[in-house]
């Protein structure tokens, strides 16, 4: 995963290899898709400074995605929030690789969290990055900051790491 930012948005690039994809082409073409975490997916959980909840963005290898705001994991979710996410996905089945480039505008985040302040150099937000890969029973779960739960569960905000805005276009994590 690589990332950067500018005055308008956050950008994340994921590069994923696979042995066997878990996708459901019946879910439709690229675009908003419910329950995407049941298939191969990359996930971004982001909590800006001062925000009590966090944003969740999931993207699959077919370009399907979902966005929501989590007030409290599994208890209080806002499915109506719209991220205005821009997603570009490349899937190469022959080389067993897929890649995601996503753009998340600050303006859209502010519609759910009006107190959002545009990041400045030195600001720290909370973040975790995930990947779910493969088919059952060999399904695998990857986390930048592992949650150490008995059953796979990424909704553990205390496990989020720090995303430090170092300079225009540069983060430290």
Q: Where are each of the predicted segments found?
A:
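Structural preference for beta-rich elements and adjacent junctions enriched in aromatics
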Residues: 1-173
């Amino acid at each position: 995963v690589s990332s950067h930012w500018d005055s308008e948005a956050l950008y994340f690039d994921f590069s994923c290899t696979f042995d066997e994809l878990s996708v459901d082409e019946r879910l439709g073409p690229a675009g908003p898709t419910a329950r995407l975490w049941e298939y191969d997916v990359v996930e971004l959980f982001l909590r800006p400074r001062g925000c009590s909840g966090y944003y969740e963005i999931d993207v699959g290898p077919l370009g399907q995605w979902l966005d929501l705001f989590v007030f409290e994991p599994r208890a209080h979710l806002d499915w109506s929030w719209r991220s205005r996410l821009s997603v570009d996905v490349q899937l190469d089945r022959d080389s067993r690789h897929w890649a995601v480039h996503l753009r998340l505008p600050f303006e859209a985040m502010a519609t759910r969290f009006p107190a959002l302040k545009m990041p400045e150099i030195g600001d720290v937000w909370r973040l975790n990055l995930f990947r779910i890969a493969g088919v059952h029973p060999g399904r695998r779960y990857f986390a930048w900051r592992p949650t150490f739960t008995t059953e796979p569960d990424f909704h553990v905000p205390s496990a989020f790491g720090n995303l430090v805005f170092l300079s225009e276009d540069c983060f430290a994590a």
